[in-house]
């Protein structure tokens, strides 16, 4: 039976997931319902939530909650769902910490501007107007790959 450290960890995971779900709803609404005049405000809202998401998901408190739950669950089989969750959370924490908050914010803003530019370029059948945004996105994705590391 999971104890209080695991339950506390789950509450943190739920909070992080709730922010991610709110981002998804805001993104969907932006793409489907929102008038163009609200775009800059929506981008700011989404960037703020991405910042909070990154802060929570990379915090020392979250890392400590993971380790406290892991200690509490020590001895469980590796294929137990709780053990698997601990492994995934540890992996995600290490991975998320490789991206600075400034990088996450930049990626969020650039991605949002690129989406708007893509939408306008598609309507105007003008790839050239979207190309600089795409180039910047590719540059950021390459930087992310460098931060994460990879094997050739």
Protein language model features and the residues they cover:
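A well-structured
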Residues: 1-152
């Amino acid at each position: 039976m999971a104890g209080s450290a695991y339950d506390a960890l789950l509450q943190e995971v739920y909070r992080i997931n709730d922010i991610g779900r709110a981002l998804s709803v805001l993104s969907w609404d932006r793409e489907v319902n929102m008038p163009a005049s609200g775009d800059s405000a929506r981008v700011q809202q989404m960037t703020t939530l991405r910042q909070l998401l990154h802060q929570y998901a990379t915090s020392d408190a979250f890392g400590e909650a993971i380790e406290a739950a892991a200690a509490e669950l020590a001895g469980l089989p590796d294929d137990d769902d709780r053990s698997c969750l601990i492994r995934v959370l540890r992996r995600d924490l290490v991975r998320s910490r490789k991206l600075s908050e400034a990088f996450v914010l930049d990626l969020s803003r650039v991605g949002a501007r690129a989406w708007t530019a893509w939408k306008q370029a598609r309507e105007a059948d003008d790839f050239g107007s979207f190309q600089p945004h795409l180039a910047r996105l590719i540059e950021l994705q390459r930087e992310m790959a460098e931060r994460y590391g990879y094997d050739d």
